[in-house]
Amino acid sequence: MTKPIPRIGLRRNGRIGLRKNGRRISKGVIHVQASFNNTIVTVTDVRGRVVSWSSAGTCGFRGARRGTPFAAQTAAGNAIRTVVDQGMQRAEVMIKGPGLGRDAALRAIRRSGILLSFVRDVTPMPHNGCRPPKKRRV
């Protein structure tokens, strides 16, 4: 029988591997994707390489609680805490989606002490593209 391959790194919240703490980042981009079911916060450098990320699900919220504003605030705080330790001082914020966590995540980002150069809404809006699904009848 073959030997199992040992896992290298830290397994926390379903993620395997340690974060790269070697890079010093002064400016970055914070992407907030807020759906009705979850909120995902991704922090990248200006070239688009992911530095840190978090979501309401990885913060321990399950089911309907993932879509709440408090869960979005917690996810944003978790993602930003690591990049503040790496020296990030300025950021641009891109917010996508119609979820409840939009404002709460932005509030958590503002409270973190990072200077925001701009906040942009990048929610995709169709110019009358695909036909939407039929209305629910309850």
UniProtKB/Swiss-Prot annotation:
GO terms for molecular function: rRNA binding; structural constituent of ribosome. InterPro entries: Ribosomal_uS11 (IPR001971), Ribosomal_uS11_bac-type (IPR019981), Ribosomal_uS11_CS (IPR018102), Ribosomal_uS11_sf (IPR036967). One of its GO terms (biological process) is translation. GO terms for cellular component: chloroplast; ribonucleoprotein complex; ribosome. The keyword Cytoplasm does not apply. Keywords: Chloroplast, Plastid, Ribonucleoprotein, Ribosomal protein, RNA-binding, rRNA-binding. It is found in: Plastid, Chloroplast. Belongs to the universal ribosomal protein uS11 family. HAMAP family: Ribosomal_uS11 (MF_01310). Part of the 30S ribosomal subunit. This is Small ribosomal subunit protein uS11c.
